[in-house]
């Protein structure tokens, strides 16, 4: 993980620069009055990964300056990370320093925190882990009150569970999300809540049915589900589908049909070009002119999915790459126009800016 530069005094200026770039990028499509959702200037990251730098019997967390990638910068703490991570870092380091089984050939430490107060740490080694490691790791995890996983090549030791349970309030509902180690989760918990709130605000009053592609662990699915009669959500990752199934049950959501398939497969199914056993119990007809929600990878929507999107009256689009978002808007501009826009600063002090658009049929 490269070392970011961060100065809370500079944050408003940096955010304003990113917002100006977005508005300039989308001005030709009539974007105006963009809703701006800022991050906390510090303690915003719910995930953090650090190399472990050894000097004799000592060790420290380390990151690297991209301008000098061979020279480690050792850290006592990391202010962009959640306060719970910052509080844990020195305590965990001291435990690791004091135990040869835990320290030997330790390469990396990954932290996964939640707004609800849970913590999971993954320790990655350049050696096989043995019973002595497991005994020491169990004792340390109990003393620190954390979940712990040990990894090495071809080996994964989970001491309790390989996930955390996130929980927060949104629009009067208490939402819970299973977040699995190694799977994608939103890195900025505070901004994620703002994204969910904006999406719900835009969808309020739509009614009818919702199709969601790339649903992940159900982050948006669960937040949006009360606003629609029925939801059909798709996701290709097996671990994300399992997490989404857990999350739907944990939040008592009963109007969602979740199918493991790619956006291209679903597009072909809805167009009648292919039939899939996974969809045999789902009537697709009510979803043909529903609302479409997409939160695609950085590559944006492919040509097949864009063709699918043209058939929907409303498209809610969350993007982590405004360049591919712009390309997709150009491809859709003959059928859809932008009605609302928002930016979400998931990654302060970087050039990245999460974007949200509501597009409606012309």
Swiss-Prot record:
Reactions catalysed according to its record: uridine(54) in tRNA + S-adenosyl-L-methionine = 5-methyluridine(54) in tRNA + S-adenosyl-L-homocysteine + H(+); uridine(341) in tmRNA + S-adenosyl-L-methionine = 5-methyluridine(341) in tmRNA + S-adenosyl-L-homocysteine + H(+)
GO molecular function: rRNA binding; tRNA (uracil(54)-C5)-methyltransferase activity, S-adenosyl methionine-dependent; tRNA binding
Domain of life (superkingdom): Bacteria
Catalytic center residues: 320, 354
Annotated GO biological process: tRNA methylation
Keyword set, alphabetical order: Methyltransferase, S-adenosyl-L-methionine, Transferase, tRNA processing
PROSITE patterns xrefs: SAM_MT_RNA_M5U (PS51687), TRMA_1 (PS01230), TRMA_2 (PS01231)
HAMAP family the UniProt entry points to: RNA_methyltr_TrmA
Protein name as catalogued: tRNA/tmRNA (uracil-C(5))-methyltransferase
Organism whose genome encodes this protein: Dechloromonas aromatica (strain RCB)
């Amino acid at each position: 993980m490269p070392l970011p530069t961060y100065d809370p005094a500079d944050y408003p200026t940096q955010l304003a620069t990113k917002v100006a770039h977005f508005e300039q990028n989308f001005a030709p499509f009539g974007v105006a009055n963009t809703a701006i959702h800022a991050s906390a200037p510090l303690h915003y990251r719910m995930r953090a990964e650090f190399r472990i730098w050894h000097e004799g019997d000592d060790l420290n967390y380390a990151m690297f300056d991209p301008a000098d990638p061979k020279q480690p910068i050792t850290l006592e703490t990391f202010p962009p990370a959640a306060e719970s991570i910052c509080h844990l870092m020195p305590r965990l380091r001291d435990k690791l320093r004091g135990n040869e089984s835990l320290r030997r050939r330790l390469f990396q430490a990954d932290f996964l925190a939640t707004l609800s107060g849970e913590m999971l740490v993954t320790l990655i080694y350049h050696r096989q882990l043995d019973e002595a490691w497991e005994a020491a790791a169990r004792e340390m995890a109990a003393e620190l009150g954390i979940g712990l996983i040990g990894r090495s090549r071809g080996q994964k030791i989970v001491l309790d569970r390989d996930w955390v349970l996130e929980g927060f309030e949104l629009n009067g509902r208490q939402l819970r999300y299973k977040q699995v180690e190694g799977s994608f989760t939103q890195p900025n918990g505070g901004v994620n809540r703002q994204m969910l709130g904006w999406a719900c605000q835009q969808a309020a009053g739509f009614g009818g049915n919702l199709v969601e592609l790339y649903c992940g662990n159900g982050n948006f699915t669960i937040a949006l589900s009360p606003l629609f009669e029925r939801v059909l959500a798709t996701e290709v990752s097996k671990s994300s589908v399992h997490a989404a199934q857990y999350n739907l049950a944990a939040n008592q959501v009963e109007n969602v049909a979740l199918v493991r398939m790619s956006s291209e497969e679903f597009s072909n199914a809805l167009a009648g070009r292919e039939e899939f056993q996974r969809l045999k119990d789902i009537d697709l007809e009510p979803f043909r002119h529903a609302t479409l929600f997409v939160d695609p990878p950085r590559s944006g929507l492919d040509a097949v999915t864009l063709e699918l999107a043209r058939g929907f009256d409303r498209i809610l689009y969350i993007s982590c790459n405004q360049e591919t978002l712009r390309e997709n808007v150009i491809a859709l501009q003959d059928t859809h126009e932008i009605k609302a826009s928002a930016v979400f600063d998931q990654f302060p002090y970087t050039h990245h800016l999460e974007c949200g658009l509501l597009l409606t049929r012309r």
